Amino acid sequence: LYVIDGVPIDDESISGLGGALSTLSPGDIETFTVLKDASATAIYGSRASNGVILITTKKGKIGNPFKLTYTGNFSLYTPTRKVDVLDADQYVTQQKIWNPNQVGGSDALLDTTNLVNTNWQEEIFGNSFGHDHYLNLSGASKNTPYRVSLGFSNQDGILQTDNYQRYTLGFSVGPTLLNDHLKIDLNGNGSYVNNRFANRGAIGAATQFDPTKPVKDPESPYGGYWAWLQANGDPVGRATGNPVAQL
């Protein structure tokens, strides 16, 4: 269970996101406290059976001068390990050993004509870039501290077509009234997330797909991607799908 500025948030209640924390800009976090065991259950009930993470966001402070801060970072990610698979020549050699009496055409799955050498893992994986930008404005006007923050994060995945974008807005204002007898704290945090999770089935397909086949086929009716087809033009149902097409 996460509690952000006193508001309990269950991870399970946010569909399509990596978790509750993915909606919050790291630059907005002031403190991070973990409660566990009986203390968490006593306060938050059964929802806290696995512990509670208390998060408070930053706020303006009385006496602080106006301050504008920008923070940015850029990241590069690269895949480091791939499955060792057969290249085209090795694949053809093994096909001749395993199926010496079957030559392309009689079975589409054994067709090794128009030989190319496609490394399917290299086709679906690649270097990716990420960048984060954070703008914070804070200060105080007499007895009213304030703070406004804007954040933007963009992350491409090492699996092609994977992408995550997040826009965040945070604000807080805490006026003190009636000769310091009344203090009001108003704060809010909002986020807009736009993500695309690529089909993970393409990863397994890339380790199994025929390396003698090309990624693209100009005559293919399926988006121009090469595919196993029957004589009538329908896909071969038992064949592994083109990994790139799955993305």
Language-model segments: residues:
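Short acidic/polar hinge/loop motifs at secondary-structure boundaries
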Residues: 7-36
